[in-house]
Amino acid sequence: MAPIPPTPAQDISILHPKVLLLSAGITTSLFLGYRFYTRYVRRVRTYLDLTPSIIENNKKLYGYVTRVGDGDNFRFYHTPGGLLMGWGWLRKIPTTRKELKDETLMIRLCGIDAPEGAHFGKPAQPFADDALNWLRGYVDGKYVTITPYSIDQYKRVVARAQIWKWTGKKDVSAEMLKTGYAIVYEGKAEAEFGDNEDWYRKLEAHSKRLRKGVWSLGKKLTTPGEFKRVHYRGE
């Protein structure tokens, strides 16, 4: 009995449906893997990791507040993916200053200015401690979502910060304006509001009418911007 001849090899074109399907599958897998990595794995450690696309596309970053340093800024440790990626139970969030070195963003709350604390031998403004204590109680040691808008001259990330409370998601800048412990940011060159400037100004006007916080000072009020111009810039 004659042997069965082998099946001749077939040359498959790169345009063959099977090849195209396989290529599409590999490309899709790589793309989804990259998206998963950038969204849920890769950390933004410092302001140097903030790419133009993150800022231009208003990408939200989820993370943990490690320290509140002033009435309108705090340290933010990025935890991509949050609890679903093990943060807080499988993946440890650093707590010591040494561990946190070069691992956090300094966040400057957008659209507002809080009373200046005592710095460099200069006196604190009225309500500076109230603003600091309020912000500590509201966000310190808690998870927040930030939307970076820009990086200022001090390498701080000017951002909108939002936090979940029992009554829903809250805008931290807006809540500070409601208390009267902050005013709408006066500087024009570095002002960042997102789409919320009109809303912020209405909240400020309401607190002013009720004479809440700094507005209780009446004509004695020196705004944070004025205070900095006099005490730090010698104007």
UniProtKB/Swiss-Prot annotation:
Residues bound to Ca(2+): D113
Locations listed in the record: Mitochondrion; Membrane
TM helices/strands, residue ranges: 15-37
Active-site residues, as the UniProt record annotates them: R108, E116, R156
EC class of the enzyme, as a word: hydrolase
Residues of the TNase-like domain: 59-217
Domain of life: Eukaryota
Major subcellular site: mitochondrion
One Gene Ontology molecular-function label: endonuclease activity
Membrane topology, as annotated: Single-pass membrane protein
The protein's Enzyme Commission number: 3.1.-.-
Cellular compartments per GO CC: membrane; mitochondrion
Keywords assigned: Calcium, Endonuclease, Hydrolase, Membrane, Metal-binding, Mitochondrion, Nuclease, Transmembrane, Transmembrane helix
Family: Belongs to the LCL3 family.
Annotated protein name in UniProt: Probable endonuclease LCL3
Provenance organism: Candida tropicalis (strain ATCC MYA-3404 / T1) (Yeast)
